[in-house]
Amino acid sequence: MAAAKWLIASLAFASSGLAFTPEDFISAPRRGEAIPDPKGELAVFHVSKYNFDKKDRPSGWNLLNLKNGDISVLTTDSDISEITWLGDGTKIVYVNGTDSVKGGVGIWISDAKNFGNAYKAGSVNGAFSGLKLAKSGDKINFVGYGQSTTKGDLYNEAAAKEAVSSARIYDSLFVRHWDTYVGTQFNAVFSGALTKSGDKYSFDGKLKNLVHPVKYAESPYPPFGGSGDYDLSSDGKTVAFMSKAPELPKANLTTTYIFVVPHDGSRVAEPINKRNGPRTPQGIEGASSSPVFSPDGKRIAYLQMATKNYESDRRVIHIAEVGSNKPVQRIASNWDRSPEVVKWSSDGRTLYVTAEDHATGKLFTLPADARDSHKPAVVKHDGSVSSFYFVGSSKSVLISGNSLWSNALFQVATPGRPNRKLFYANEHDPELKGLGPNDIEPLWVDGARTKIHSWIVKPTGFDKNKVYPLAFLIHGGPQGSWGDSWSTRWNPRVWADQGYVVVAPNPTGSTGFGQKLTDDITNDWGGAPYKDLVKIWEHVRDHIKYIDTDNGIAAGASFGGFMVNWIQGHDLGRKFKALVSHDGTFVGSSKIGTDELFFIEHDFNGTFFEARQNYDRWDCSKPELVAKWSTPQLVIHNDFDFRLSVAEGVGLFNVLQEKGIPSRFLNFPDETHWVTKPENSLVWHQQVLGWINKWSGINKSNPKSIKLSDCPIEVVDHEAHSYFDY
């Protein structure tokens, strides 16, 4: 039992004199969403914790008592990939990755109050996840997803024949997407059933591919699609799933349909919102998401954007009647926020939605028949919402969330009432000890066109009478934001606790502040956003006495990496002691090498060959900009980043080196646009924080701060001189 204690809280990690170290950050327990049982008494959630000594991440499943917040261990079996409630008291269904079928998984059934008596219902001949279940007569129908072969069978990688050649041949896009070369396999939703005999259920191994009959359809859609891309009606008879429009080029357009199909696959799936279809509202042809059946199964709510090539357009709630030819209805269509998830109340009269609002992921409610002018009401909760589930048949919801100061917040929220706290990780995990909301505050500054929001993040033990170097962190996207949420990659608090005050701006292009601010970055990447950042920096310099801008640094990833490269060639670049650019674009024309062409074609108002001047306008490699470079810069780029080729980072480093500017190149051959592997993440932090600490003077003022020499990886240096001797 002692070995499982970290599953309940965590074991203390031996840290340095710094309050919140990269080791603390990486090794802190990570908890998944809490899913309540049908009665609203218990919730189950996944938890894992990285162990630096053993170089592994054991995981397991916990139970959360929804009355008092107590947590208990359900199982420490790391092979269990998911658990869901069977719908019958405290009985559960889980997927076990070790199975008698090579490359397959086992479906097991147990009871949350007596887990040891689990039994195997059957096997699935391939990787399979995302279970959703519903009773249908004497059976329990389910859906989940896996990869499909071109024939429609569930793909089993372990059983696949080895190809005679490594060649890849393409006649259409995508060639590669995010971090993967696209192959002939594709994601598909499969249906099956658990049959009851006596007091046990069994599965015969038979699955029906509901997506394959629609040529060129795919669901869930990669790289981030999951179980939220499909739903099963409460009677288990009908399935809804999301797929990109099969007839349109997927790399160029974002148009997405919601398909409806019988659970048994007796008919081919049909879209309810086909572009220019008789039911689809006029002019609505963008990305769809979050399909969910009403409790009676007669309606489907989903979200959809209007623009066909814009991934950051505003989502609007839509409701369609199942099996009807009536036009799809738009709900609260004038609301200037972009909902992300929608669910029905148990009586089908109210919709609960999450949406980003002023840098916080909030929960809202609105009537299911709300007029266009209706403004949804906020449900009180702490931090940002990651997911939510109804507690029994009540109006209360169990929220799984996080914030800038805690990586897990479990709470119960009820419209019109204060939230009820169940478990906040920063109050339990030793690694997060000392983190709290008091060190976080918003900052509003007049920007290029409107007021711009930023977060100020202070270090542990902050003293307003002392002065701290500025860490100016620029988010990616560009249509994204620094939210009141926990990041497992770029975490402002880790930076702050090296001895900085972090300012994390949300300039033009950011989401959650109204669609106009998001849209205004179009064809203006280095325009208004750069001016916003200059104004924020000037405000900090002139008005916040405890921030030292003379010894500040700037860093960013993706669009933030581009902006750091842009800053290097402009006046603001001379205001920083050091720069860090992670996966940022360098040469304007290289953007054509990206995967999702709709992104660049929207943001630069045309194709690469028709609007070349727009791509060149924001080219960081222009000779007149490169001539101004002088600030020491760390460049990071990874081999499996197929959004922005690693050649971008190498080219940037080449120029920095040839100009004699102190610089370093950090590369992970096994990472993507993000760095996610624990040991790589530690090296990333050692290099990034060591770099900025060297140039900002933190290494001198705080001997316990991270130094470049703390990283055990040997540096490749074949030159007779070293910039690091300067």
Swiss-Prot record:
One of its GO terms (molecular function) is aminopeptidase activity. It holds the Pfam family Peptidase_S9. Transmembrane segments: none annotated. Residues 1-19 form the signal peptide. InterPro entries: 6-blade_b-propeller_TolB-like (IPR011042), AB_hydrolase_fold (IPR029058), PD40 (IPR011659), Peptidase_S9_cat (IPR001375). The active site is at residues 558, 641, 673. It is an enzyme of class 3 (hydrolase). One of its GO terms (biological process) is proteolysis. Belongs to the peptidase S9C family. This is Dipeptidyl-peptidase 5. It comes from Trichophyton tonsurans (Scalp ringworm fungus). The lineage of its organism: Eukaryota, Fungi, Dikarya, Ascomycota, Pezizomycotina.
